[in-house]
Amino acid sequence: MPIPRVLEPEVMADADEASEYDEMDFSATDQRFAERAAELARGARVIADIGSGNAKIPLAMCALLPAAASVCAVEMSAAMLAVAARNRARAGVSPRRLHLITGDAKRLPFAAASVSMITSNSLIHHIPEPRSVFREIARIARPGAPILIRDLVRPESEAVLEQLLHLHAAQSSLMQRRLFADSLRAALTVNEVREALDECGLAGVAVAQITDRHWSAERA
């Protein structure tokens, strides 16, 4: 049995926490996500990235996708959007290429069947009832649109959680270690993800654990 799920705040509203999160080094996992998204894109023109945070993943995607593709980065936190805007400016990416949108993942600002690809990384563990997000993804996706969703896996025990902290956050600050631990406790298990996706009409989405701490849900 995994440890009990302990929810964390849905929105990172604190500017200091947003800046601290931006300093955490997820570059390797971010790049792998962007590369997989580019592989799945199949010429998608409008890509919705849900819960984009500091926008480092959408920026990495923009570097790999054809020039005709645009990414709509949806984020609820004003503090995170401010960080995302700084990162976009620093990268020299046009707002027409990467749109930063204030929005709630449970009520996405897109028409039904209007989005040609949907991506999301490290959002689901923030959501008290993840089915609300999965239903919205099913609503806005065009029929058969590629989907790539990744997040953390809730550990089987506190001992496993401590091991993950040691392996992946030993050199991090106390706040960064706390953020990582809180996120692990708030995450879903692979079986919980599968059950939720099945209930929300997202046909053809395959779910697997891909690292010691991540799951991936994909539709090619």
Language-model segments: what does each one mean?
Residues 48, 54-107:
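Class I SAM-dependent methyltransferase SAM/SAH-binding core
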Residues 1-20, 24:
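N-terminal, positively charged/glycine-rich alpha-helical extensions of SAM-dependent methyltransferases
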Residues 145-151:
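Conserved beta-strand signature within the Rossmann-like core of class I S-adenosyl-L-methionine
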Residues 119:
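A conserved beta-strand element that flanks and buttresses the S-adenosyl-L-methionine
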Residues 132-143:
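A short glycine-rich, Lys/Arg-flanked "PGG" loop and its adjoining helix->strand segment in the class I
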Residues 152-200, 206-208, 214:
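C-terminal alpha-helical "lid/dimerization" subdomain adjacent to the S-adenosyl-L-methionine
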Residues 125-126:
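A short His-aromatic
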Residues 27-45:
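Conserved alpha-helix/loop element of class I SAM-dependent methyltransferases that forms part
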